[in-house]
Amino acid sequence: MANIKEAILTPIFKGNPISVLVLGICSSLAVTVQLKGACVMGLSVMIVTGLSSLVCSLLRNTIPNRIRIIVQLTVVALMVILVDQVLKAYAYSVSKTLSVYIGLIITNCIVMGRIEAYALGNKPFASLMDGLGNGIGYALILIIVAFFRELLGSGTLFGYQVIPQAVFDAGYMNNGLMILPPMALILLGCIIWVQRAIQKDLQEK
């Protein structure tokens, strides 16, 4: 039970795939202009990572070592296709906004990395929890970045106006820089800086 708890919690805080391992940062720059897109992308990665790790763990004793990467890619691609089809069926506008980024989950370092590093050497349930934990850690960073980008860049959250019109009438203007990709990188850098300031053991000696 302790190992299961560690598999879920470690990727969220101490071993976050984006802020600690610096993996999967491309999508954190691309899909964090709006909070809605970031939430959907985070949920998609969480589902794909969890289910892919589960399936690969179930098959771990039957996969020949020389073709394991091909099998892993096939499993991940299947999960991504399923998620993409569900989005197109039930959230078409979001699917259209995210466009190719959902498909690029197939090449996400986090998904392949957890299968290779954890799922192939551990039991199915633990692998599922590890995949979900890494997906949650990934989604958390995306949501934080998207929150500030949408709020300060557009004055909205989930598309709804949250900054009162009176504030704009007083002279406030949305920060156009926040919706540009470089600002996502700067915000991500700030998150990494804050985390390493809090967790001293993450600082390089």
Model-derived regions: residue spans:
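Cytoplasmic-side transmembrane-helix entry/capping segments in multi-pass membrane proteins
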Residues: 63-76, 97-103, 130
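Short amphipathic alpha-helical coupling elements at transmembrane boundaries
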Residues: 10, 57-61, 126-134
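Hydrophobic core segments of alpha-helical transmembrane domains in multi-pass membrane transport
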Residues: 23-29, 45-50, 77-84, 106-110, ...
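Transmembrane alpha-helix boundary signature
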Residues: 82-97
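Structural signature of hydrophobic alpha-helical transmembrane segments
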Residues: 35-51, 71, 95-106
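C-terminal transmembrane helix-loop-helix hairpin of multi-pass membrane proteins
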Residues: 6, 128-205
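N-terminal membrane topogenic signal
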Residues: 8-18
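C-terminal ends of transmembrane helices
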Residues: 52-65, 112-122, 196
